[in-house]
Amino acid sequence: MSSKGEQPLVLWYNQLGMHDVDRVGGKNPSLGEMITNLSSLGVSVPNGFATTSYAFNLFLD
């Protein structure tokens, strides 16, 4: 995980929802919503993770 006061560098799709668009872009939260809402209905959604905008900004610095 991250140190106190820092934000995470990556988030698993099952941790994401549409409220996370500002942290991980648009497509990743959609995949998170699909995993959360459709996996139990038998829809196969591959698990994965998203790098955060915080991680991207650290990389640029």
Swiss-Prot record:
Matching InterPro entries: ATP_grasp_subdomain_1, PEP_synth, PPDK_AMP/ATP-bd
Catalytic activity of the protein: pyruvate + ATP + H2O = phosphoenolpyruvate + AMP + phosphate + 2 H(+)
Cofactor(s) the protein needs: Mg(2+)
GO MF annotations in UniProt: ATP binding; metal ion binding; pyruvate, water dikinase activity
Pathway(s) this gene product operates in, as recorded in its UniProt entry: Carbohydrate biosynthesis; gluconeogenesis
Enzyme Commission designation: 2.7.9.2
Homology family: Belongs to the PEP-utilizing enzyme family.
Function: Catalyzes the phosphorylation of pyruvate to phosphoenolpyruvate.
UniProt comment concerning the protein's domains: The N-terminal domain contains the ATP/Pi binding site, the central domain the pyrophosphate/phosphate carrier histidine, and the C-terminal domain the pyruvate binding site.
Note: The reaction takes place in three steps, mediated by a phosphocarrier histidine residue located on the surface of the central domain. The two first partial reactions are catalyzed at an active site located on the N-terminal domain, and the third partial reaction is catalyzed at an active site located on the C-terminal domain. For catalytic turnover, the central domain swivels from the concave surface of the N-terminal domain to that of the C-terminal domain.
Protein name listed in UniProt: Phosphoenolpyruvate synthase
Taxonomic placement: Bacteria, Pseudomonadati, Pseudomonadota, Gammaproteobacteria, Enterobacterales
Gene from which this protein is expressed: ppsA
